[in-house]
């Protein structure tokens, strides 16, 4: 019969698990490899309690972030279409292109919510028209709206 002990992983290990995972390993593996190389710590009653408290705090922070993202998405869901004016040349071609900064500032002026460039997904826009604009907060929190490019005459 092999002696198995419980350890808490401090680093991601392909064959055991990710950081914070509680695993049972043979005592030789733990004391000769994992613990001396600071890959794991011995799972005592105190360290398990501390680990559980840490996981609870981490989950609470994730829930708060999820709630904030959900509230932001609700604000953006109220917007069905935004319009941007651009200077136009021949054949309804716009000068330059519509970039993320313009969209972010336009949405900020409407909602008061700041977005990052990585949240905005829009096609390459070189002409007047209506395009789909996607705002992706997380894989399950997404907002779609229309982006209308109008001519601007100076």
UniProtKB/Swiss-Prot annotation:
Key words, A-Z: Chloroplast, Plastid, Ribonucleoprotein, Ribosomal protein, RNA-binding, rRNA-binding
Pfam families in UniProt: Ribosomal_L9_C, Ribosomal_L9_N
InterPro entries reported for this sequence: Ribosomal_bL9 (IPR000244), Ribosomal_bL9/RNase_H1_N (IPR009027), Ribosomal_bL9_bac/chp (IPR020594), Ribosomal_bL9_C (IPR020069), Ribosomal_bL9_C_sf (IPR036791), Ribosomal_bL9_N (IPR020070), Ribosomal_bL9_N_sf (IPR036935)
Main location: plastid
PROSITE patterns from the UniProt entry: RIBOSOMAL_L9
UniProt keyword Aminoacyl-tRNA synthetase, yes or no: no
Subcellular location(s) of the protein: Plastid, Chloroplast
Keyword Iron-sulfur (UniProt): no
GO biological process annotation, one example: translation
Highest taxon, organism lineage: Eukaryota
GO molecular function: rRNA binding; structural constituent of ribosome
GO cellular component terms listed in the entry, alphabetical order: chloroplast; ribonucleoprotein complex; ribosome
Entry function: Binds to the 23S rRNA.
Family of this protein: Belongs to the bacterial ribosomal protein bL9 family.
Protein name: Large ribosomal subunit protein bL9c
Organism of provenance: Gracilaria tenuistipitata var. liui (Red alga)
Gene: rpl9
């Amino acid at each position: 019969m092999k002696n198995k002990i419980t350890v808490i992983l401090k680093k991601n290990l392909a064959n055991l698990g990710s950081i914070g995972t509680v695993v049972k390993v043979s005592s030789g593996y733990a004391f000769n490899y994992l613990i001396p190389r600071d890959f794991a710590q011995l799972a005592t009653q105190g360290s398990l309690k501390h680990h559980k408290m840490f996981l609870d705090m981490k989950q609470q922070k994730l829930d708060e972030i999820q709630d904030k993202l959900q509230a932001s998405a609700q604000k953006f869901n109220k917007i069905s279409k935004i319009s941007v004016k651009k200077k136009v040349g021949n054949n309804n071609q716009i000068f330059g292109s519509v970039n993320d900064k313009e969209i972010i500032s336009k949405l900020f002026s409407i909602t008061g919510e700041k977005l990052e460039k990585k949240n905005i997904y829009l096609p390459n826009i070189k002409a007047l028209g209506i395009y789909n604009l996607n705002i992706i907060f997380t894989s399950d929190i997404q907002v779609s709206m229309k982006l209308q490019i109008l001519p601007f005459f100076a």
